[in-house]
């Protein structure tokens, strides 16, 4: 299955100093032949976060965009348009979303389901049951690193 990479996974891949860089790189290396995907939301989020002065290893937005564009040129990359709406009746089981912080995760999971792929994230507690048609195979939560990178 093609893997839609969450913003946090894209950041970990692009920032060699990120505490989850090794875990993200290792996972993608093992699954690259299945393909990976990004979408406007994940691309924008990656550029926004990595270019913020408050981010420890920040860089200018143009530099981050160039690096992300280079990664997206890889033959295994798929670009998924924002083809789903959370407002489509039945797409989201709203009572299963306990907090607003899960809305973006639910959207990206729904996009993965729509594209017959899987959503790969570092986030714990992604509400699988909140997305119509989502099954365990549609979600991969990477194990977080337990040590700080230097």
Predicted regions span which residues?
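Proline-centered loop/turn at the N-terminus of a beta-strand
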Residues: 2, 35-37, 78, 118, ...
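Short, well-structured N-terminal submotif of metal-dependent ribonuclease cores
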Residues: 1-38, 50-66, 131-134, 145-149
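Acidic, PIN/NYN-like endoribonuclease modules and their adjacent C-terminal/linker elements
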Residues: 85-98, 109-150
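Acidic catalytic patch
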Residues: 16, 37-44, 66-97
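Anion (oxyanion) recognition and catalysis
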Residues: 32, 72, 113
